[in-house]
Swiss-Prot record:
GO biological process, any: peptidoglycan turnover
Record bears the keyword Transport: no
Keywords assigned by UniProt, alphabetized: ATP-binding, Carbohydrate metabolism, Kinase, Nucleotide-binding, Transferase
Name the UniProt record assigns to this protein: Anhydro-N-acetylmuramic acid kinase 2
Gene: anmK2
Family membership noted in the UniProt record: Belongs to the anhydro-N-acetylmuramic acid kinase family.
Family annotation (NCBIfam families): PRK09585.1-5
The keyword Cell membrane is assigned to this record: no
Length: 378
């Protein structure tokens, strides 16, 4: 039975803390993609972004031991207010009203993610108050997408596989194609000819490269991969890094943005350090492809890392795969993650599963997220 296509709004702020709120409209029934709507980046004010960076630092010290850092409450209130305003602004700009919106998918800001280990469930913390957002927008808000999966033994990530599958449905002969998202970490979604999904974090992506550039006082990121392009990969350190046990570990598996750092290139030059970190990210993608039952021959890349041509060239070289940008296929590469959470919000309203044994390792397929009901606008 076909269900009506409805507009949903998705929100995402990544762990690289680029200072922006990603917000996107998507028309969907929770299974198919009806239309891509407008999307936008709304910057946090400088104070909020600085506060979130303090939260990441506090979360590392906290490590799920004892009471949460007090700073979380202030940050949660500020980002909920800012992201609510971003939703309202995008909806108005699109010529819609909140009455036209079925739900908002509010991921929140991840400050800490600890994957499960033998004998221990995983834990995760995203800052964001879904109840407050629902009250502000007078619209249903789906939030806290990861906790239930982790309490049931799953990795809590990646959540994007089912949306990536819907994107692959828009292509012909997609069985040889996988989707690679390059955010703070890199995650991949592949689907075989029978429609079976596999998804996992392959390794680091932008986070350690950005952190290295910031540490060297060279800005916020390696813009366009220019620094890495000037450097040479340190073969000895590169070879040692490739022996990291995570790379050969069977999926499902997930990472926190701090699981891979940049200390191991500390004594290299700026350019050589950036080149070596970038090559490691690219090779980790290749190692991830090697774990799949059928190795894809093409990657469609979304997320901020797709704007780094040096990284994309290295992925093609080290991972031995054809690399396309999301825009090459008519997708919105900057909006993919935000669109995903709009899609997941609609799936939650319909109680459709989001996580699976092949994606997060949870034993049985599960819906994701809690629903905060908003009253109709008056």
């Amino acid at each position: 039975m076909a269900h009506d296509m409805r507009w949903c709004v998705g929100l995402m702020t990544g762990t690289v803390l680029d200072g922006n709120i990603d917000v996107a409209l998507l028309q969907t029934d929770g299974e198919r993609i009806g239309a891509f709507g407008p999307h936008a980046l709304y910057p946090y004010d400088a104070g909020t972004n600085a506060l979130l960076k303090q939260c990441l630092s506090a979360a590392q010290t906290w490590a799920f031991n004892g009471p949460e850092p007090a700073i979380f409450a202030e940050a949660e209130a500020r980002i909920t207010r800012a992201q609510s305003d971003a939703v309202a602004c995008l909806v108005e700009t699109a010529g819609l009203s909140m009455r036209d919106i079925a739900a908002v998918g509010f991921h929140g800001q991840t400050v800490l993610h600890r994957a499960p280990a033998p004998g221990r469930l995983g834990q995760t913390r995203q800052l964001g108050n879904g109840q407050d957002m629902a009250r502000r927008l007078a619209t249903d808000v789906v939030y806290d997408f990861r906790s239930a999966d982790m309490k049931a033994g799953g990795q809590g990530a990646p959540l994007s596989a089912i949306y990536h599958s819907a994107l692959l449905d828009t292509l012909d002969n997609a069985h040889d194609t996988a989707i690679l998202n390059l955010g703070g970490v890199a995650n991949i979604t592949a689907r075989d000819a029978r429609g079976m999904l596999a998804a996992f974090d392959t390794g680091p992506a932008n986070a350690p490269i950005n952190d290295f550039v910031v540490h060297r006082g060279l800005g916020e990121m390696d813009r366009d991969g220019q620094l890495a392009a000037q450097g040479r990969v340190d073969d000895a350190r590169f070879s040692t890094a490739l022996r990291h046990p995570y790379l050969s570990r069977p999926y499902p598996k997930s990472l926190d943005r701090f699981d891979f750092g940049h200390d191991w290139v500390a004594d290299l030059s700026d350019a050589d350090g950036a080149a070596t970190l970038t090559a490691f990210t690219a090779s980790a993608v290749g190692r991830g492809l090697d774990l799949l039952p059928v190795r894809p021959t093409r990657l469609i890349v979304c997320g901020g890392g797709r704007r780094n041509p040096t990284l994309l060239k290295m992925i093609a070289t080290y991972a031995k795969v054809h690399v396309d940008n999301a825009e090459d296929w008519g997708w919105e590469g900057d909006a993919t993650e935000a669109q995903c959470f709009g899609y997941l919000a609609m799936r939650r309203l319909r109680d459709l599963p989001v996580t699976f044994a092949e994606t997060t390792g949870v034993r049985a397929p599960m819906p994701a997220g809690r629903i905060a009901h908003g009253s109709s606008p008056g």
